[in-house]
């Protein structure tokens, strides 16, 4: 049998019900790797197919059932186990088991978080307004199959030659840390160019999962460059560079956590960073803005990391609550906004606040998707009139200049030529993977990358997935070009030196 229709059906079912694909596999046939094996060309028996179909039929997606995870205190272990389950408990066993599987993926601490109910109420608020590019699985698939992070780090590193840092430290702000791949690579480049200079590096990231991934990459950075102060925060663009919030209500709930790492090996640093997991799980929380559907923090958090044995050297640059200046030498603004957001929004809410954080001689490098590449050919084969990249660098710089007004007189706005501004990144494939018959896993990865970059919403994806012709469009583009690549464009805003 052809597996593509079944994979599409499972994917759509999981999206509607709100299950991860691994959870679906465990719930349906007790195999969490079911979907991944099918995508990699695995086979199933007719009996297994019947079990999968039977599970979806017994738990229809159309009823709007959602899995709700709530906190509660675990039941005491000494409760009377001799009393058997009630009839009500027996009738809910199936739903509780399914909910528990979901909790393993949604909850960072199963000892504190348990499933208490499955609701049949349809969701109508913005929290259920799922956006494709916020999906963790698809985000991680994109960053691990494409070289964008590498190329962005290479482009940012070119700006280091133009910096003229002043004592006491080279100051860098990353306006969207993501999984930390770009920042870690840039930190290596910084050490290569400025091996003895103290670093103050601050990064904004609201996603708990991305903060975890970032922290996994920095232990060796403290070993190679001990004169480093690393700060992570979930504050908004207007507040994050100065590590202070303007709202009195938010300021009263601010969590400021300083960690002086002991020892002198990457292993000891990693152990102490990993031990921060309970702190992160308890404090790095986000909710959904009911008006915009975007993520906002529950409380502002600042996490400060540095080596204890270098505290004396780093004392002048360790940030203090309420007394942190911006004055950054380099600001990295890599994909910091939605592609389809208005030019005015990008200029006013994102770029302008970051530009104001530049110190004398400081440079902001902005990077966003450009289009005009094979990936957009895939999108246009499915949605011929779709144009996700509505703002080019020229229009954005003009809007930022207007927004800043007189405050922008000492700034240079550098759009640069296409030859210098544009750069390409690729999806990783072997030549044999795009010649002749292209495997399903390669097609799915290419399709995922194309619609992730184009930020296609789920509402438009559902009918396309149901038709199933999107893989044919993807196959045609891959065979025509011998692979898949994308273009980003960059721009620089620099402040004049005194």
In which residue ranges do the predicted regions lie?
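Class I S-adenosyl-L-methionine-dependent methyltransferase module
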Residues: 125-127, 188-326, 449, 456-466, ...
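Conserved class I S-adenosyl-L-methionine
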Residues: 167-180, 202
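A short glycine-rich, Lys/Arg-flanked "PGG" loop and its adjoining helix->strand segment in the class I
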Residues: 324-325, 345-360
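Class I SAM-dependent methyltransferase Rossmann-like catalytic core
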Residues: 122-167
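Conserved beta-strand signature within the Rossmann-like core of class I S-adenosyl-L-methionine
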Residues: 361-369
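Short, basic-rich loop-to-helix N-cap that marks the start of a DNA-contacting helix
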Residues: 36-53, 433
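N-terminal, positively charged/glycine-rich alpha-helical extensions of SAM-dependent methyltransferases
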Residues: 77, 94-138, 266-286
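Substrate-binding/catalytic lobe of Class I Rossmann-like enzymes that use SAM or dcSAM, i.e.
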Residues: 370, 374-478
């Amino acid at each position: 049998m052809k597996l593509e229709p079944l994979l599409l059906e499972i994917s759509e079912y999981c999206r509607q019900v709100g299950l991860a694909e691994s959870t679906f596999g465990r719930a349906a046939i007790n195999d969490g790797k079911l979907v991944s094996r099918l995508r990699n060309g695995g086979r199933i028996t007719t009996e297994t197919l019947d079990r999968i179909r039977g599970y979806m039929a017994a738990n229809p997606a159309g009823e709007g059932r959602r899995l709700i995870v709530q906190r509660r205190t675990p039941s005491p272990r000494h409760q009377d186990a001799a009393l058997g389950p009630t009839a009500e408990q027996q009738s809910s066993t199936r739903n509780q088991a399914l909910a528990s599987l979901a909790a393993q993926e949604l909850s960072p601490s199963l000892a504190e978080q348990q499933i208490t109910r499955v609701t049949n109420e349809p969701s109508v608020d913005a929290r259920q307004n799922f956006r494709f590019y916020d999906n963790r699985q698809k985000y991680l698939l994109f960053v691990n199959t494409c070289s964008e992070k590498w190329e962005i780090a290479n482009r940012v590193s070119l700006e280091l030659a133009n910096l003229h840092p002043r004592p006491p430290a080279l100051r860098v702000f990353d306006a969207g840390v993501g999984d930390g791949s770009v920042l870690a690579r840039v930190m290596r480049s910084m050490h290569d160019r400025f091996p003895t200079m103290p670093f103050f590096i601050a990064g904004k990231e609201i996603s708990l999962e991305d903060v975890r991934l970032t922290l996994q990459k920095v232990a060796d950075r403290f070993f190679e460059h001990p004169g480093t102060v690393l700060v992570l925060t979930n504050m908004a663009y207007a507040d994050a560079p100065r590590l202070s919030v303007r709202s009195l209500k938010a300021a009263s709930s601010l969590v400021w956590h300083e960690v002086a790492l002991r020892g002198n090996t990457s292993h000891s640093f990693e152990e102490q960073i990993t031990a921060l997991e309970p702190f992160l799980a308890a404090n790095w929380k986000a909710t959904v803005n009911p008006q915009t559907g975007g993520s906002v923090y529950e409380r502002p958090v600042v996490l400060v990391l540095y080596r204890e044995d270098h505290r004396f050297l780093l004392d002048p640059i360790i940030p203090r609550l309420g007394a942190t200046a911006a004055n950054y030498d380099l600001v990295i603004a890599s994909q910091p906004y939605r592609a389809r957001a208005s030019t005015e929004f990008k200029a006013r809410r994102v770029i302008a606040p970051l530009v104001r954080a530049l110190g004398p001689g400081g440079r902001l490098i902005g990077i966003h998707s450009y289009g005009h590449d094979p990936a957009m050919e895939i999108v246009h084969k499915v949605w011929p009139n779709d144009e996700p990249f509505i703002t080019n660098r020229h229009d954005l710089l003009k809007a930022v200049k207007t927004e800043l007004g007189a405050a922008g007189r000492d700034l240079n706005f550098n759009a640069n030529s296409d030859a210098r501004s544009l750069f390409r990144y690729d999806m990783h494939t072997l030549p044999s993977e795009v010649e002749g018959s292209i495997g399903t896993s390669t097609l799915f990865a290419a399709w995922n990358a194309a619609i992730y970059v184009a930020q296609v919403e789920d509402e438009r994806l559902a009918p396309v997935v149901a038709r199933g012709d999107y893989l044919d469009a993807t196959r045609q583009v891959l065979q025509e070009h011998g692979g898949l690549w994308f273009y980003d464009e960059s721009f620089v805003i620099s402040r004049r030196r005194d």
